[in-house]
């Protein structure tokens, strides 16, 4: 089942999504500096049951960007909301990875009409707001645990996004307080946690789960931070089972 690129003009920017599969839509929102092509493995596993949109934020992947933008998680969230409207997707489930999970929490709280369910895969930045230095140190610990085949696609994605954009967003993540928004997330929520992920602290998942009215946590034994790449079948199975139960 081949993927196709679709472009939608959003606020003057051509915004890209890699689309594959059949069935109701499911949107993947990438992590910091990541690109749609880094989620091909999990998209293939999800595609038999869903039409999967692997979304590229502005300045990421194949989406156009502007110098110095986006600067904030709020800006990422607002563009995602506008893209969902322009793409005609309506109210959909979203799977966010790493920083992308924080973006979809923001979206679910501030734009609830766009979100039918939340799947937060290795969510970062909540509620501890680690500094850029701490984030980088944890990612370096995670690097040797990841699948070697992810290295070149990730390098291409980070080169496309650029260090300046990534640094701005990482700095904003260390300041952005999503915690107070979590009780306003009314969509059913699944939190996915890899037991070998040094980037995420177990207590943060517990805090998120306690704050969101309808949330559950599933652990993936041996899972690294890039769960969608290292355990695509498990992530897809948990996601599809959850969406069936939630009727989303």
Regions of interest found by a model, annotated:
Residues 151-180:
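Hydrophobic, aromatic-rich cap/lid helix
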């Amino acid at each position: 089942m081949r993927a196709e690129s679709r472009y939608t003009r959003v606020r003057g920017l051509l915004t890209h999504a890699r689309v594959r599969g059949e069935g109701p839509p499911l949107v993947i929102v990438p992590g910091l500096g990541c690109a749609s092509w880094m989620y091909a493995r999990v998209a293939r596993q999800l595609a038999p049951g869903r039409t999967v949109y692997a979304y590229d934020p502005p300045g990421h992947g194949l989406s156009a960007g502007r110098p110095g933008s986006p600067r904030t998680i709020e800006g990422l969230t607002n563009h995602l909301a506008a893209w969902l409207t322009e793409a005609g997707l309506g109210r959909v489930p979203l799977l966010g990875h790493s920083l992308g999970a924080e973006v979809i929490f923001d979206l679910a709280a501030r734009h609830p009409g766009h979100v039918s369910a939340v799947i937060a895969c290795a969510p970062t930045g909540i509620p501890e707001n680690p500094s850029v230095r701490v984030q980088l140190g944890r990612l370096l610990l995670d690097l040797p645990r990841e699948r070697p085949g992810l290295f070149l696609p990730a390098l291409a994605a980070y080169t496309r996004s650029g260090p300046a954009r990534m640094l701005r967003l990482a700095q904003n993540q260390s300041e952005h307080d999503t915690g107070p928004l979590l009780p306003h997330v009314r969509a059913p929520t699944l939190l996915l946690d890899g037991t070998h992920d040094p980037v995420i602290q177990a207590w943060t998942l517990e805090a998120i789960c306690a704050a969101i009215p309808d949330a559950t946590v599933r652990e993936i034994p041996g899972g690294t931070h890039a769960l969608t790449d290292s355990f695509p079948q498990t992530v897809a199975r948990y996601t599809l089972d959850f969406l069936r139960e939630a009727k989303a």
